[in-house]
Design a protein with these regions (language model features):
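A conserved alpha-helical element in kinase catalytic cores
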Residues: 28-81, 98-111, 222
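Active-site Asp-x-Gly
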Residues: 178-179, 192-238
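Conserved kinase catalytic-core helix
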Residues: 89-130
Length: 239
């Protein structure tokens, strides 16, 4: 039985929780993996309803600078949904480098516009204190200081670095959580060169998050456009 299930999965286009079936060039049916138990299938279904609600909200903004593929329906009793395909290809650094300067500018403008619109879908929350240490991989830094620095640095330099680490651990600042996509990476953003269409997909993780997290998300870091996205975000937000 297990072998048969494994062979079945090999024939599916699937991710960690879902598999998809294409209906022509424009539509996708999505269902939970057959390996999921009842609780996991129900959790999957709840996530799809959360996704659809977020998609419907951001589509209602109707911003022409970007595209949000429509989730057409969810059938709870059959654990399946139907949604539109996003045109184009995943927005990787390799693709971005081949685009014209105009297209690159439009992408930067589209990302910033999307971020502003997402942040404004729901009320921004109150200021919260946030430690810089929470953003850094302190375990790796600790390991380097304690176990590897002695190979290249003397005792005084190691002591100085340890003091810097300890000081950073106490730094904190105030910031506001805002409604965000929370999973912006090249796998969830597509671009169609022929139509200059920028599409955002996969809103399963949408939630309140610190504003800068989506501004400096993996997508912008990998494309090396985080600075112009930030500047454009500020300009649009302040208009």
């Amino acid at each position: 039985m297990k072998t048969a299930m494994t062979n079945e999965l090999k024939n599916l286009i699937h991710g960690r929780e879902s598999y998809i079936v294409h209906f022509g060039p424009d539509l996708i049916m999505k269902r939970p993996l057959p390996t999921l138990g009842d609780d996991a299938r129900d959790a999957w279904l709840n996530k799809q309803h959360h996704t659809k609600n977020t998609i419907d909200d951001i589509r209602a903004v109707d911003n022409p600078r970007y595209n949000i593929p429509r989730m057409i329906f969810i059938k709870d009793d059959e654990y399946q949904l139907l949604e539109e395909c996003a045109p184009g290809y995943h927005l990787t650094p390799e693709l971005f480098k081949t685009l014209s300067r105009r297209q690159q500018y439009e992408i930067i403008d589209g990302i910033a516009s999307f971020l502003v619109d997402m942040n404004e879908l729901k009320p921004v929350q109150d200021l919260q204190k946030h430690k810089i240490a929470d953003e850094l991989k302190f375990d790796k830094l600790d390991h380097f200081i304690e176990n590897k620095m002695h190979r290249w640095f003397d005792a005084d330099e190691i002591k100085q670095m340890a003091q810097i680490r300890d000081n950073i651990g106490t730094f904190e600042y105030e910031t506001r959580p805002a409604w965000s996509h929370c999973d912006l990476n090249p796998g969830n953003v597509l671009y169609d060169q022929k139509t200059s269409t920028l599409s955002f997909i996969d809103f399963a993780e949408a939630n309140y998050n610190f504003i800068y997290r989506d501004i400096f998300a993996p997508l912008q870091i990998e494309l090396n456009i985080f600075r112009p996205v930030y500047e454009t975000y500020c300009r649009i937000h302040n208009d």
